[in-house]
Amino acid sequence: MISAGAITRIPLIVRCITHLWGRLSMATLKRDARIAGLIYLALTITAPFRLIYIPSTLFVHDNPAATAGNIQAHELMFRLGIFGDLLTGVISLLLTFSLYQLFKGVNKTLASLMFVLGFMDTPLYFFNVLNDAAALLLVKGGPILMAFEQPQREALAALFLRLHGMMISCAEMFWGLWLFPLAVLVIRSRFLPRFLGYWLILNGFAYLALCVTGVVLPAYEDVISKLAFPLQLGELAFVLWMVVMGARPRADIAATSVAG
C-alpha cells in the first residue's frame, strides 16, 4: 500500500524528471546549433575561394589571353577552385540538413521549404564546375582541340568562365529565397535572437537584388553589390552567433529550470 509520504513526493519527482528532461533537451539543442554553425562556417570558408579569390587573382577583365596565361601558370590553384566548388556543394547539402534537424521542431512545413530551397545549391554547384572544367581544357589545349587556333581557344575559355559567373547570378536567386523561411524559423524559434532573423530577411533581399542585376541589369551589378554588402553580413552574424553562443534556452525550459 502506498504511504501518504510517498504520494506527497510524486509532484517533486515529476518536477525533477521535467527539469532533467528540459536540461537534456537544451543540451541537445545547443549541440545541434553549434554543429550547424560550424558547418555554416566551413561554407563561408570554401565558397569565397572560387567565388572571390580565383577571379580576383587569375582573371583579367576583357583580356582572354592574359586570363588563359594566368590559368596555365597557376593550374593547381584553378583546379583547387574547381574542387572547392564541389566541396561547397557537399557542405551546402550538409548545412541544409543540419538546419532542418535544428528547426523542424519549430515549424516542420517551413523547415521543409527551407530544406528544398537550400538543397538547390548543391546541383547548381556541381553543374557549374563543368564550365570551369571546359575552360581549363581549352586553355591547356591538346590533340582534340587542334582545329581551334589559340586565340579561339582563349576566347572560348573566357566564354565558359563568363557562363560560370552567370550561373552564380542565377544561383543567388536560391541563396536569397532559402533565407526567408530560415529567417522566419529563427524569429519563431525562441532559442535564437530575433534580430538575426530580421537581418537574414534583409540578406535574402540583397541576394535577390544581386540576382536581378546580374541577369537583367549587369551594368549596375557593381553598384548594387556595394549597397548590398552590409545586408549580406546577416549570414555571417548568424554563423558567429551559432558557433560562439549556440542556442539560448527556450522560455518554457528556462521557466522550468527556475521553478526547479
Please report, for each region that a protein language model flagged, where it lies by residue:
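Hydrophobic, aromatic-enriched alpha-helical segments typical of multi-pass transmembrane helices
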Residues: 6, 12-260
